[in-house]
Amino acid sequence: MNKLELWQRYRKYLGVYPEIGMMLDLSRMNFPDDFFQLMEPLMQQALEQMAELERGGIANGDEKRMVGHYWLRNPELAPTKEISSEIGFTLRAIKEFTENIHSGAISPPNGSRYTRMLIIGIGGSALGPQFVADALGSAKDKITPFFFDNTDPDGMDLVLARIGSYLKETLTIVISKSGGTKETRNGMLEAKKAYEDRGLLFARQAVAVTGRDSELDRTAAAEGWLARFPMWDWIGGRTSVTSAVGLLPAALQGLDIDGLLEGARLCDMVTRIRETRNNPAALLALMWHYATGGCGAKDMVILPYKDRLLLFSRYLQQLIMESIGKEFDRNGTQANQGIAVYGNKGSTDQHAYVQQLREGINNFFVTFIEVLKDRNGRSIEVDPGVTSGDYLSGFFQGTREALYEKGRESITITVDELSPRTIGVLIALYERAVGFYASLVNINAYHQPGVEAGKKAAGVVLEIQGKVLAHLQEKKGRGFTAEELAAAIGAEGEAEAIYRILLHAAANPDHSVVAEKGRTVFDKKFYHGG
């Protein structure tokens, strides 16, 4: 197409949504003119399934659960008065607790005020809060957030070192729906030890966000933690950012959670519209279907031209890949669905992988995210009549054009500014687009059996480790190769796992395992040196 034809296509396929301060440009996707007409029956079916989900139908059939994250920003939509009341009560409790923390009515044992918080969670229990904190935080935050989002000891040491002597002014929030997530449990125990090492009582500075009567809930109640906030079984981790999971840390940080909820609520209203061409989430889902052939044939690259949206691609990576990446469809037929998602930020990526996007394998489509407002206040001119923000906008348009010249397709989302409201809009937009796409390809977006499989496999490894260490201790001073140990404990098929266990144990002082050099790496002998 020439420039005039592209302009006409842009006019035809630019969606403008003033209610949410957003535009959606599909003009650089090469779908045929009859694409929407062909997909309309499937899209209307997806819209009806979404409406049934919001009415309280069992949308997660595998776990026989309702799916209710949309109720969080409009409790009146909840299917029962009890659920509606619980949502409202929890929001009020978050605000009251936050006010008490900020005012000093609830203070650390040393009598000062809380200046930092340590959020312990993994997956959706960390990615959502991290994204919001990074996107909306400032040097004027009322409380500075830190995160344990893994079970990496060195990573936790680094976070604790950064908190340093301020641990006495640090509120810890432990987030786990089940209350039994090992990574989160480990982080909690590491944090508890750090408090105790400084003569502090962990329970006096701890808050739980968890399911009612979970292991974590019972622990927090028994130990007298400062507060407990609910995670309901109808909220999944990756869609929990507008629940206490995301709202409590954001409120404590000093962010406008009402604005966040309002943006999500308004976007929910716009994305309930039954006319496909007026529904941005429906259009996004249809573009994903077109680009990937409905079977994940292309990757999704997220390119926000805003530093504050750096973590958005990581947040979307979980939201989309954990929701869409499924082995079976809702009929039990093997489908192996999924869309790979990755990204960073522009214009940084122009000096990284955009080279391949333009000239390498064409196995992707890009979503550009443009923010019109550069900053609060005026900018200096870095060239005559040109600001740094003008350069950023120019690089965005240049990259979009350079990719299209090579037949690389893209979607562009434009928002007026970055604010709590627009972050709420973006979160809600993608939540609903994921739900629509899942309906289009007939999968359950709201469970994650693959994650559970990994957890079970890890449990098996740790069980083998226990047997290996027990045998080495029993035969103290005697060396064994991995194969010899596998035979000794009756686990001949686990020699590789045992070898890796031994390498890790020998590299750390915790289990008193020592490695002797062998003729080859597999002839190494390991023994208990305690």
Swiss-Prot record:
Alphabetical keyword list: Cytoplasm, Gluconeogenesis, Glycolysis, Isomerase
Annotated InterPro entries: G6P_Isomerase (IPR001672), Phosphoglucose_isomerase_CS (IPR018189), SIS_dom_sf (IPR046348), SIS_PGI_1 (IPR035476), SIS_PGI_2 (IPR035482)
BP GO terms, sorted: gluconeogenesis; glucose 6-phosphate metabolic process; glycolytic process
Top-level taxonomic group: Bacteria
Residues annotated as the enzyme's active site: 322, 351, 455
Classification via Pfam families: PGI
Catalytic activity: alpha-D-glucose 6-phosphate = beta-D-fructose 6-phosphate
Protein name: Glucose-6-phosphate isomerase
